Amino acid sequence: LAKKKAAAAKRGVKATDASKGKGEPAAKKPVRRASAGIYSAAAIKVTAAQEQAMRETVARAAAAGIIGAPSDEQWAMILCRQPLTRIFAGAGSGKSTTLVLRVVFMLCHLNVEPERLTVISFTNASCAELRERLLKVLGFWQSPVDAQAVRQCVRTFHSAMGVLAREVLGSPGWFEQLGDKQASASEPDNPLAGGRLGPAQARLLKDAYQACYTDDPAFRGWVHELLGSQPPDPQKALPKAPMQPFRLPGELHAAPLFEVFYGQAGFIESIGIRIEQLPVAALACSPAERAFLLALQVFWKAFVQELNQQGLLTFNGAFQQLTQRLDDGDERLGADRLAGFSHLLIDEFQDVSPQIVQWLQALHRRLAGAGTPVSLMAIGDDWQSIYGWRGSSPELFMAFDRHFPSKGKGKSAVLMLQANYRSVEPVIRAAESILADVAFKQDKATAAIRSAPPGSHGVKLVTPFDPARDLSALHREIAAQCEYARSIDSRERTAVLLLGRRNDTLKDIQAGLDRKLPVKAYTIHRAKGLQAEVAIIVDDCLPTTAHPLRNALYAHCGFFANSYDQAMADESLRLGYVAVTRGVSRVLWFVRKPQGATRVLS
């Protein structure tokens, strides 16, 4: 076992002790093989004069208070010479400023044209913040790169895809934006940041469902099989399609079938599977799940046809079509049109999906095949990967060289940003302890940089906590933590972050809070990237129940070593880690009883 752990450490993956009863070991190989090499194994040419000029200008910018002086590990990222680089950037590691300086080095010292460079950030909000930082630093460098050029450079995945969709797919409208008057068709946001279906979207899905029920007897049969209801009497007029709620095993909530179809279809496409090509009979699933998938295929075909008639596309559909056209050699997607993707810097890479990986592969394979130099810098932290329920996975970041192969025997450069400038040591160590049972992760040695103020502490569990009974005590505690932040002259913009998994829980708590208190409330997913002097968590991070259908889909897609259930068990612990690492000098966690992510803290 010691040899196995040593070998796993060399690969950057934590070995899983089978005696822990964690299910399938992480060493299980996905069926998907590495494709032919895309990236040059040769280093990017950087002269000593270029490096020296960058170091000198950074020193002047730091002296002027424009930026902080980079650490040695940050300099390694800024000056990296490899065309294919993976950066493990831990919580609070200063990656955003480092990313800005890397872009400045490329634009101002390596003379990369802004028209050949794209920086991908997670949401429109994070893009806006990154653009603002980049413009400020470029101004100090007296660069001619202006706000318009920076706006073109810094995008979400969906915004970058949208540029190609407008040029090649006929400027489609987006299904995800139906009914959203604030949405921008030219700047689509990452749907991971979005909410529930709106009325216009639900109506279109419902119409497709009703049409299938009316026109397809097999579909009708599957619907009644799934709902456990009697099919309509063939001697009588056909009733409307049933709208009773349906709960798929593994899902938390019941919903009308058309909503459940849409949710699972999004997941299926996100993990790189084309719904119409799914070999339902070959999947290792139950008869009920097979009936669900067969009905889904009929529904999805009708839904896509309805979208086409209205000039609409889903984001997933656009990624699929563009990837297929790139692979097929569509002349409208030549090297000139793709030039902006030549040099890619992608933040939050731990949250990409197989579908995004397929698109990135197709982009860079097409460019490299045309003789265009390409580079990819992927920045992420597998410890903060929390979107597996939408199809994303840290496995894609950890098995990076399989998906983004270099030519010959080359491998990606691997750099680590392990200093934590945000949280005090007790908070960091408590957060790390939560991850002890994560089956598949990159081991890191995080160093705490911030000194601990008087009264600081790691995670304090408050248990038993019943929201219905103990709300007044929680309100008093929140006020006390705001006073603590004031007493130590906290420099944080927010004194207290109130965190939970569900909006309804947070709204109930906020209803009784003094609105003048410096408190902000977010779901844990929305709080990623934020920080406050004190983090207060009001949820246990328990994994969801077993999801047999998604286990079967995970096994079929060929991208993953883990089962979906194992991925979700790991993700529930990572969610706890993300929540704790929002706190700077104190964390309080209110739970009914120690379980899930809080069990190890009790």
Label for each model-derived stretch:
Residues Y39-A42, R203-V298:
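Conserved ATP-driven helicase/translocase motor core recognized via long
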Residues L1-G173, Y577, T581:
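P-loop NTPase Walker
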Residues T545-R550, A555-S602:
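C-terminal accessory regions
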